[in-house]
């Protein structure tokens, strides 16, 4: 059974620097993904069995404390925090490599539309000038065919990335990556961070720092897009509280 109490969750942003090198699957969890996982066994398995799970929500941090969970994260680690850390790490490595006459490091963005990916490539050239950027936009459909999956995997292998971002929105991105993990012959960290694609491309604005620092980024998004977000944040947060009460009262 999927339970927050028993999940292993990273404790702080500082711990990102302790992650081992090599093939590593990094997922995020928030109140919405927790609620979704309770109804989706494959998504629950993907979150439970990935290599690293980061608390992308103040609600997760507070809930872990309240229910006495095994993991006690000390702060929220947003998907953007993971992205920022990993991209800067790879930029430094790539700068050192190119200074020695070696090939630049490659970051790959798999997911989203070609329009968004083109914007990502343009901005990455400005912010991370020493990185080589590759992209792949999969077809927009609820389920991929075997041919679609082979094409995605082939594109990833052709890129041979030193860092791979998967952005197809949750839970699709987590389930796809987990289901095809053994088929991916890669050597790098892989992060499932769909919303960050839009943040970095500039098609969606993050909340101002005040909202972020006070754990209110969810409220900012609700106020900006009430018709799209009310179900996720009003109904979803209420359901999350109910689920946490159930966990707290259970043995």
Where are these regions (language model features)?
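N-terminal nucleotide/polyanion-binding subdomain common to many enzyme families
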Residues: 1-84
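A short helix->loop->beta-strand "cap" motif at the edges of active sites that frequently abuts
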Residues: 23, 104, 185-189
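Short glycine-rich anion-binding loops that position phosphate/pyrophosphate groups of nucleotides
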Residues: 31-34, 168-173, 196
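A transmembrane-helix-recognition feature enriched in membrane-embedded lipid enzymes
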Residues: 61-62, 206-251
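Conserved beta-alpha
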Residues: 67-95, 101-155, 159-160
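Short Gly/Thr/Asp-enriched flexible loops that form oxyanion-binding sites at enzyme active sites
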Residues: 121, 174-183
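Short, flexible loop segments at boundaries between secondary-structure elements
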Residues: 138-143, 186-223
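Proline-aspartate-enriched helix->loop->beta-strand connector
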Residues: 156-165, 169-170
């Amino acid at each position: 059974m999927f339970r927050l109490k028993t999940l292993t969750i990273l404790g702080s942003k500082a711990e990102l620097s302790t992650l081992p090198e090599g093939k590593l699957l990094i997922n995020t969890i928030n109140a919405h993904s927790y609620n979704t996982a309770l109804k989706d066994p494959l998504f629950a398995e993907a979150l439970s069995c990935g290599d690293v799970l980061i608390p992308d929500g103040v609600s997760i941090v507070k809930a872990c404390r309240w229910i006495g969970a095994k993991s006690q994260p000390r702060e929220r680690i947003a998907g953007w925090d993971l992205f920022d850390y990993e991209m800067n790490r790879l930029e430094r490595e790539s700068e050192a490599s190119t200074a020695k006459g070696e090939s630049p490091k490659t970051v790959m963005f798999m997911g989203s539309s070609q329009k968004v990916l083109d914007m990502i490539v343009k901005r990455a050239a400005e912010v991370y000038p020493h990185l080589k950027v590759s992209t792949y936009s999969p077809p927009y459909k609820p389920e991929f065919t075997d041919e679609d999956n082979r094409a995605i995997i082939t594109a990833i292998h052709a890129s041979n990335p030193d860092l791979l971002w998967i952005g197809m929105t949750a839970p699709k991105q987590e389930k796809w990556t987990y289901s095809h993990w053994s088929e991916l012959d890669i050597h790098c960290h892989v992060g499932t961070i769909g919303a960050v694609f839009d943040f970095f491309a500039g098609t969606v604005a993050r909340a101002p720092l005040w909202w972020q620092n006070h754990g209110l980024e969810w409220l900012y998004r609700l106020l900006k897009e009430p018709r799209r977000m009310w179900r996720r944040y009003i109904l979803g947060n209420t359901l999350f509280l109910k689920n946490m009460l159930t966990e707290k009262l259970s043995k």
